[in-house]
């Protein structure tokens, strides 16, 4: 495991707390965090180091949270 991957994994619990607070659903939160970690690990070069790693990951997570809400609101309306 690379140092970058270790740093990302170290932040997973903080990302989970944020996602749970926003979504109020553990399964949805876990999905959003997993998608965030995957996106970060697939393109580590996207992290330019201009901010803290946590700030960058939370930015990705916010987009994934919106995706989760959209996905589940569509399912609820079906």
Which functions belong to the PLM regions below?
Residues 1-17, 21, 27-30, 41:
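A short, charge-rich alpha-helical start-of-domain segment used by transcription regulators
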Residues 7, 11, 15, 36, ...:
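Residue-level preference for hydrophobic side chains embedded in well-ordered alpha helices
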Residues 25-26, 50:
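Short loop-to-helix capping motifs
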Residues 31, 35, 67:
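Acidic active-site catalytic centers that drive phospho-/nucleotidyl reactions
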């Amino acid at each position: 495991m690379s140092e970058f991957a270790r740093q990302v994994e170290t932040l997973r619990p903080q990302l989970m707390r944020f996602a749970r607070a926003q979504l109020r659903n553990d399964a949805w939160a876990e999905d959003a965090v997993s998608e965030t970690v995957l996106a970060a690990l697939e393109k580590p070069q996207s992290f330019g180091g201009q901010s803290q790693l946590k700030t960058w990951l939370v930015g990705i997570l916010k987009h994934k949270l919106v995706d989760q809400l959209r996905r589940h609101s569509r399912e609820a309306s079906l």
